[in-house]
Amino acid sequence: MSRRIQVIGAHSADFVWRAGGAIAKAVELGGIAEVVAISYGERGESGELWKDENQTIENVKRIRHAEAEAAAAELGASFRALDLGDYPLQIGANELNLIADVIREFAPDVLVTHTDTDPFNPDHPVAHHAVDRARSLAAGAGVQSAFKTVRPPQLFLFEPHQPELCNFMPTTFVDITSVFEKKQAAMAHMKAQGHLQTYYAERAEHRANHARRASGNSEVRQAEAFQRVIPQVVSEL
């Protein structure tokens, strides 16, 4: 069976910067990838678009959707937007159930989202807690008779913009050397946040240095960092 990876971000561009390489790598290896945006980031993540004095919320959403859809396609993934609003992102019972339904529907082997702390972004921790809780609901052992459940997906956190301030501890490096050009092409679609392209290209090189030292593999030129949340179950060390 093809390995299934689902990346759920607070805003429509979050996946590109932080997990674009891992998504493309999974697809390159025969996997199936889905990107889910809880919101478009139309209020707090679209500064370039709001320089137009005639700009509107609906037009920003339209542009952000097109950008994210094109970026996901570059990586070989599908894109889905929940359009729940941002700044602030607010998750009630209905929104939580929607996210749980999205997880059940896709049934990922690997689920990726934000860290639980981010002092510079009010929406990222909200998204983390929502996805973490929705995962538990979607994979809730012992309640199969009440609603459909899925096999518990592995949960990873992608690297935040300021990792030292977000309690991020990398436990896994993904070698994205072979797909880095795809990540660059995907990032190029995000014109509403174009200033981040250089930052995350450089970050991939920094993490590749760490990956080389950790693995001894001198061929790693670009990498992405992730933090594993759920213990890995193996038959031997």
Model-flagged regions — what are they?
Residues 1-6, 29, 88-237:
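Metal-dependent de-N-acetylase/amidase catalytic core
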Residues 1-106, 236:
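Active-site rim/loop-helix segments in enzyme catalytic domains that contact anionic ligands
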